Amino acid sequence: MTDTLRIGTYNIHKGLSSFSVRMVLHDQRELIRSLGVDIMFLQEVRGKHDRHSRLFTGGQYEFLADSIWQSFAYGKNAVRSNTDHGNAILSKYPIVQWENEDISAHPTEERGLLHCEIEVPGWDVNLHCICVHLGLLGSWRHQQLIALENRIKSMVPEGAPLIIAGDFNDWRQKAGNTLAADLGLKEVFEHTMGKPARSFPSVLPFFRLDRIYTRGFDIKHTKIHSGPRFANTSDHAALTADLRKL
């Protein structure tokens, strides 16, 4: 039985470098492996891309999962003529159920909530994980946070451990008010550092866009993964947190 988890979140920018100059998916895979996480929340993941099909078979999430994270789920949100992208969750433990809920607030910006139930050995209840990538406008994010709140209240048992992570695009830092007050969630960097992590742009992080919210855990350690290695592989820094189940 394990009562501790390391989890991470990372917007991989569709497998492209910070300024979309080159494909860096192989580098991203090595960086994600180096984080040592049990569960990884990913945003801007391509499910397919006709031009890149010769580089790897299947979606980017399968390539990144490789043999390390043997269970994974992909929520397709945006579909174009030759490609699609969305959110993904990679897990070392079995994903026993998952659903992708459309929370798009505008036809030009498709968004979703990827909700997975994960069976962690020795736990008496399943772990609920929700990967999010919220909209660019405040009014859109407001609608999407309401959808997130409604889903949690209706689909997540009150005593079940819960992790919500991803790119909240919340540069005005308003999401936490809803999630903390109404749902009893803690943002891990607020807990350890007093404020959410600066995660964007990765070359010199300033904006606090990416978040990890938890319920039912003791937050042991948090880390922002930026610097040259990460700046060369995405426009976002990666975040990790070590958690112990209460």
Which residues fall in each region the model found?
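Active-site regions of metal-assisted phosphoester/phosphodiester hydrolases
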Residues: M1-I39, D66-S67, S71-Y74, R80-L246
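Acidic/histidine-rich, surface-exposed loop or edge segments in extracytoplasmic proteins
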Residues: L42-R46
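Short, flexible/disordered intra-domain loops and linkers
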Residues: S17-R22, G47-G58
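Secondary-structure junction/capping motif
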Residues: L55-Y61, K186-E190
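Glycosyltransferases and closely related glycan-assembly transferases
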Residues: H52, G59-I68
